[in-house]
Amino acid sequence: GKIELTAQVDGLFTLDRRRLYAVNSLGEMMIATRHAGPVKKGDKLAGMRVIPLVIEKEKMAEARETAGNTPLLTLTPYRALKVGLVTTGSEVYYGRIQDQFTPVIKAKLAEYGAEVTHHVLLPDDHAAVTEKIKEFLADGVDMVLCTGGMSVDPDDKTPLAIKNAGVNVVTYGAPVLPGAMFLLSYTDDGRPVCGLPGCVMYAQRTIFDLVLPYLVAGVPVTREQIAAYGEGGLCLNCKV
């Protein structure tokens, strides 16, 4: 008969595509999964069964060997992160325009149980932004998000500020629209420090929505993962 896996907690569902393909290529058995990504408690994760009525022991042993000794499917619970938010931009800092970025970020974080515990408004001063990133990290936040100042305009210096904070940059730029000017980095102890482009403020879904579940779950995001987003990375503004 069929066996189903369901999520016991809210979290990030991930899988090893190469090994899943290898197991399904053996024949006489199958594993069907949902796409990797955020799930809620009670969501179906996978279904599996043998195809014939009976199956040889040797075939099952081959499947176990092919699957390997590490989990083929993984559900990682979200962590209750403390987040530092650095909102940059002289227009916002001097009150010429309203800060519309912060409410959006707080709402997106709340979806995954994360909370902004440190927040500051700063002008386009990369040294001040760098100093505040370091201060938030020293205060023990689990992640720092910097909004604004991510384009190629000469006044936009947030990428420089992040790099000067002593982090390890994974990527500056992503093959996703909207969200191409995204910056992802990590501290030496694995805390994410990100630069968010302006599209995160007004677009329903961006690169930030793709990586945020990984950041909250504590699953490292690699340069290869970001590059792979190019296939399907063009948002068509589907109603979801």
Language-model features and meaning:
Residues G1-Y78:
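Extended, charged alpha/beta regions that create polyanion-binding interfaces
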Residues L26-M29, A67-T70, I105-A110, G166-V169, ...:
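Short, surface-exposed linear patches
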Residues K41, R79-V83, G140-V141, D189-R191:
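Short coil/turn connectors at secondary-structure junctions
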Residues S90, Q100, T117-V240:
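Short glycine/threonine-rich loop/turn motifs
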Residues L12-F13, L53-V54, E91-G95, M201-A203:
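Short, acidic Gly/Pro/Ser/Thr-rich loop/turn segments
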Residues N69-D124, A128:
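Glycine-rich phosphate/diphosphate-binding loop of Rossmann-like nucleotide-binding domains
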Residues A7, R49, T87, G195-P197:
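Pocket-edge structural micro-motifs
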